[in-house]
A protein has these predicted regions:
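Conserved phosphate-binding catalytic cores of ATP/NTP-utilizing and phosphoryl-transfer enzymes
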Residues: 1-3, 122-137, 179-200
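Short glycine-rich, Thr/Ser-proximal phosphate-binding strand/loop in the N-terminal lobe
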Residues: 14-59
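Short beta-strand-loop/turn "lid" adjacent to the catalytic site in phosphate-handling enzymes
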Residues: 72-122, 141-143, 149-158
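Glycine-rich phosphate-binding loop of actin/hexokinase-like ATP-binding domains
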Residues: 150-252
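Adenine-nucleotide phosphate-binding core of ATP-dependent small-molecule kinases
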Residues: 263, 270-274, 281-316
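Internal helix-turn-beta structural module
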Residues: 300-318, 324-326, 330-398
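Histidine-centered metal-binding segments
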Residues: 397-422
Length: 422
């Protein structure tokens, strides 16, 4: 019998590096590198929740990839026949190429270089991380997992802007969307649990936030666009803004180039810009409760934008059968769920306040009142979805949905519609 695969997932940020090691679908440990003063330190977290701060320090975040093999070997996760079999990285990038998952090769590295120039805020960190893994772990498959792939098959009506279509095609200026891994995780989970309705809206509310309309398990429409800047008011992102207003901001702030404006709209706006104090929703709610005007306004803006986009997506679907709240705010903030749901009665939704306030004991809970359409809180698992998708590439002779069956012989209850057995 073949040994279970060890899969390493990388999640690099601008000021930290996070890694998770899995044995197939089972989490073994995670590593978190961050600055402590001028040195980088590492905290290892085991699957049972226990934590250990490693004694070794590192000069910078670019040195973390080179240290992983040594750390995981010393901690007993690697060694002997145990080695990393695949490395996965999430890609949020514009362009048709990155609406698919790719085994990283020379072509993929070339496309990453192009993507760095197109979206300098989102791509360089993960691209550099991928390049480091290719050099450090020679011969180990590195797979770039698209965060937009779930949205790739939407109708053109939902993908194009109202600009010259030839220009949009030539320069690939389209609404690619994001949070596809999160929404895909939710949809696949609901299918397994047999609670997936025909018309669904998934509210991914976190530091980055988006809504996605799902029709028969497929993305129909979503709030993010060419980049994750479009759509809702977020922690530090403005969300949708008139292009002329954005240019007015550039002039008012005396920015010398477009990247300064893009940085401002992505890093200095949203809840942070509105409140003038914080991008943390817990603090925003505290400020509101203390009577702070700007905190109150920031909270109201966040809720309003979710409600208005939810209404738009309901119209796009022609009705909605269920709503899902997920991600950090969606899963943890009963107050945000309560406020958003207050204006959803016209769609047939009403919260049960007691259920809404209860802790999420299972991966999903229906917090709707009796007689209401379902309102679910579901814990997303993007890493689970990344592994499922990676298996499609690693197991070329397997069913395309990642269920593990041989192509043409799928007889499990995965509820996919890949038609590999038809």
């Amino acid at each position: 019998m073949k040994n279970p695969r060890l899969i390493l997932i990388t999640n690099p940020g601008s000021s930290s590096r996070k890694y998770a090691l899995y044995r197939e679908d089972e989490l073994l440990c995670s590593l978190h590198f961050e600055f402590e003063g001028k040195k980088v330190v590492c905290t290892l977290k085991n699957a049972d929740g226990s934590k250990k701060k490693l004694k070794e320090t590192f000069p910078d975040l670019n040195s973390t990839v080179g240290a992983l093999n040594k750390i995981l070997t010393e901690e007993g996760f690697l060694g002997g026949v145990s080695k990393i079999d695949a490395i996965l990285a999430r890609i949020v990038a514009t362009g048709e190429y990155f609406t698919n998952d790719h085994l990283v090769d020379k072509e993929c590295l070339k496309m990453l270089e192009i993507a760095k120039k197109r979206t300098p805020l989102h791509v360089p960190v993960v691209a550099n991380e991928i390049e480091a893994f290719v050099k450090e772990f020679k011969g180990t498959p590195v797979i770039a997992i698209s965060d937009s792939a779930f949205h790739a098959d939407r109708p053109d009506l939902m993908k194009y802007y109202a600009i010259d279509k030839d220009l949009a095609d030539k320069f690939e200026i389209k609404r690619y969307g994001a949070h596809g891994l999160s929404v895909g995780s939710i949809v696949n989970y609901m299918a397994r649990e047999k609670i997936l309705p025909e018309k669904l809206i998934v509210c991914h509310l976190g530091s980055g936030s988006s809504l996605t309309a799902v029709y028969k398990g497929k993305s129909l429409d979503t709030t993010m666009g060419y980049t994750p800047l479009e759509g809702l008011c977020m922690s530090t992102r403005s969300g949708s803004i008139d292009a002329a207003a954005a240019l007015a901001v550039k002039r008012a702030m005396k920015f010398t180039d477009d990247e300064d404006l893009e940085q401002y709209l992505n890093k200095k706006c949203g809840l942070l810009g509105l409140s003038g104090q914080t991008d943390d929703m817990r603090e925003i709610i505290r400020l509101r409760d203390e009577g702070d005007d700007r905190g109150t306004f920031a909270h109201a803006m966040f809720v309003y934008r979710v409600q208005s986009e939810l209404g738009r997506l309901a119209a796009s679907l022609g009705g909605v059968d269920a709503i899902v709240f997920t991600a950090t705010i969606g899963e943890r903030s009963a107050e945000i769920r309560r406020c958003v749901a207050q204006k959803l009665g016209f769609l047939g939704f009403e919260l049960d306040n007691k259920k809404n306030e209860s802790d999420l004991e299972n991966r999903h809970e229906n917090i709707a009142a009796e007689g209401s359409k379902p309102i679910y809180v579901i814990r997303t698992d993007e890493f689970e979805e990344m592994i499922r998708r990676a298996k499609v590439i690693l197991d070329g002779d397997k069913c395309d949905c990642g269920c593990g069956c041989e192509k043409g012989e799928c007889d499990c209850d995965c509820n996919c519609d890949c038609n590999c057995n038809k």
